[in-house]
Amino acid sequence: MSYKAGSTKFTGLLFCALLFLSQPTIATEFWDLPPLPPADEYGNILINRTSNSKGIKPATFSHWIHRRKFTCRVCHFELEFNMKANTTEITEAANREGKYCGTSGCHDGKASFGHKKPDCEKCHNGDKSYKKERFSELSRLPAARFGNKIDWGKALNKGLTTPAKYLSIKPDADISFKETLVLESEWEGTPPAIFPHRPHTWLLDCSNCHPDIFNIKKKTTKHFSMIANLGGEFCGVCHSKVAFPMNDCKRCHPAMSD
């Protein structure tokens, strides 16, 4: 082998090695990742379906306050809140009738504050940073790099959080579907994404993902892509606003280097 050929081959190998080692950096620079709010606001939403039109401030909802106490299933299956904000026809009248937030075990005036006038501003304040001083209560939980900067999965596995799986509608049985999916990347040089069902079925009901988000029967998953995820589809329904964001590449692509 000539010196020139050997040098070219070495340069190529070096480039590939550097490319692999810098994958997370390239990913965050290549993809148009949305800017992240402060850790104490990540997952906070404003419920404003009808509030402004009625001269009322939008209601603030903090996922990190609630997810310590309840699994996703409680709100998004049992209480029938849609996965997308401001698409559930929640009303104050319904709350007072014991539906949605007013369900027994939630904001019923017993388990937590109810719907009397002195309590109104605890929700209807229009401020995503409301009660951010409580975020320090989470300082003992395992750290993560993005989102709330809390590794909620580790916190759950270590018993540092013990969210309730139900209020009154108990799951028929523990969902034992544990299959782990390996999703090959559409980009050369990027390692596959790993999807473990078990951590998701512990927090969610199967119907939270299937068939609306992932319709396996109709083969809509053939349109699954990183671009679709970043657009709020598929994994992006959760992993863009509440669950750890897609900036945290290695959480899904574990073979990536730090």
Range-by-range predicted roles:
Residues 5-6, 20, 29, 197:
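Intrinsic disorder/low-complexity signature
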Residues 2-13:
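Bacterial N-terminal signal peptides that target proteins for export
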Residues 26-258:
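Short sequence/structural segments immediately N-terminal
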Residues 12-22:
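Bacterial N-terminal signal peptides
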